[in-house]
C-alpha cells in the first residue's frame, strides 16, 4: 500500500470529528510526568452523539526527558457508543521517536496495516483484541470491564481487580471511583494500572491514569484542563 493511500485512510478517521450532526465536542489536556519530571502534555479532542464517537490526539515529549528519549505521535479513532461506553472500530496512529523513524498504523475490521519503524514496505497483521488505550482508559465513563486492550498492534490482557468508591465532597468536580487493574503484555509481563474517575458537568471523566512499573517511578497522566 502506498504511503499517500495509508495517510488518506488515517484522515478518514479524523474527518468524522467535524461531521457528526449535533455532536458534543470536548477538549482535554493531561500533563504527563515520571516522578516529578514533566515529560509533556497529552492533548486530545472528543466528538460524540448518542450512538457514535471519535477522537484525535497528540503527544510530544519535552524538557529534560528529551536528552534520553524523544517521542511524538498523532492518533485518532472512531467507533460506537453502547450504553454510554465507547467501542472502537477504526484506529490510526503516526509516530516518530529517538529510536525509530516514521511508523504508521491503520486498524480496521479486517486487520491492521502498518509501516514498521524505518521500514519501506507496509505489512498486514490480524486485528488485536479489545479497544485502544485511549478509548479504554480515557473515554470510558466507568471502570473498563473488557478483557483486552491494544495499542493498535499488540493485545494486552486486562484484569479489573478492585473498584473503590470515593465519597465525594460538596465540590462539583471531584473523584468518584478508583479502578485498579493488572495488565499482561504480549511478552507475559505484568504491570499495575490505576484509573481515577471524577464527576464533571459533562458526566464522569478520567482524572488520572497511573502506570506502576516495578522498581521504576510511576508514569502519571493527570487531567490539566477540560472544556
Q: Regions from the language model: what does each represent?
A:
Residues 1-8:
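Bacterial N-terminal signal peptides that target proteins for export
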Residues 12-13:
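Hydrophobic alpha-helical transmembrane segments of integral membrane proteins
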Residues 22-108, 143-227:
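Acidic, serine/threonine-rich low-complexity disordered tracts
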Residues 16-18:
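N-terminal signal peptide c-region/cleavage motif recognized by signal peptidases
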Residues 96-138:
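Hydrophobic, well-structured mid-protein blocks that either form specific transmembrane helices
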